[in-house]
């Protein structure tokens, strides 16, 4: 029996919709990263983008466990010597772009490189309940039903 290797032309990509309301950020990010890479498929091939297109709504209502909301810090560098800025998860979630916490969590679970950047392009995260991808008819996945630990009362 020969080892199967998917070709980019053979891959069919599905659209998946996930509602992040009340879901734990890290647990959601692992499931999304696995879907983006295509590791949930029996035809997974490491060097081919065979994952799904994932839409996440209500990202601002995702939950961090423990004291991570106040204690987890995100760093960014301005490009100038000594100009490292830091913000807590709370500041980001209450700020202008609350979806960035979830984007960063998923981004750090995807391999860095050209294929990883393509796979991250298949992720769309929205802070509210509205999204412009109704025409793609995404399949809704209920992450809370997969495991009781995936959800947390805020």
UniProtKB/Swiss-Prot annotation:
Pfam families named in the record: Ribosomal_L13
Keywords (A to Z) from UniProt: Ribonucleoprotein, Ribosomal protein
Biological-process GO terms, alphabetical: negative regulation of translation; translation
One of the record's GO cellular component terms: cytosolic large ribosomal subunit
Origin: domain of life: Bacteria
Any GO MF annotation of the entry: mRNA binding
InterPro entries, A to Z: Ribosomal_uL13, Ribosomal_uL13_bac-type, Ribosomal_uL13_sf
Function summary: This protein is one of the early assembly proteins of the 50S ribosomal subunit, although it is not seen to bind rRNA by itself. It is important during the early stages of 50S assembly.
Subunit structure: Part of the 50S ribosomal subunit.
Family listed: Belongs to the universal ribosomal protein uL13 family.
Protein name: Large ribosomal subunit protein uL13
The organism of origin for this protein: Bradyrhizobium diazoefficiens (strain JCM 10833 / BCRC 13528 / IAM 13628 / NBRC 14792 / USDA 110)
Lineage: Bacteria, Pseudomonadati, Pseudomonadota, Alphaproteobacteria, Hyphomicrobiales
Gene: rplM
């Amino acid at each position: 029996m020969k080892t199967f290797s998917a070709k980019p032309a053979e891959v069919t990509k599905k659209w998946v919709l996930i509602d992040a309301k009340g879901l734990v950020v890290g647990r959601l990010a692992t499931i999304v990263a696995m879907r983006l890479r295509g590791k949930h498929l029996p035809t997974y091939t490491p060097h081919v983008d065979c994952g799904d297109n994932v839409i996440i709504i209500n990202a601002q209502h995702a939950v961090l466990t423990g004291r991570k909301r106040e204690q987890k810090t995100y760093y960014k560098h301005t490009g100038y010597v000594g100009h490292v800025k830091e913000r807590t998860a709370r500041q980001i979630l209450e700020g202008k772009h609350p979806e960035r916490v979830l984007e960063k969590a998923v981004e750090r679970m995807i391999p860095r490189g050209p294929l990883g950047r393509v796979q991250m392009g298949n992720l769309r995260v929205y802070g509210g309940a509205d999204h412009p991808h109704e025409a793609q008819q995404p399949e809704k996945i209920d992450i809370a039903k997969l495991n009781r630990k995936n959800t947390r009362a805020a």
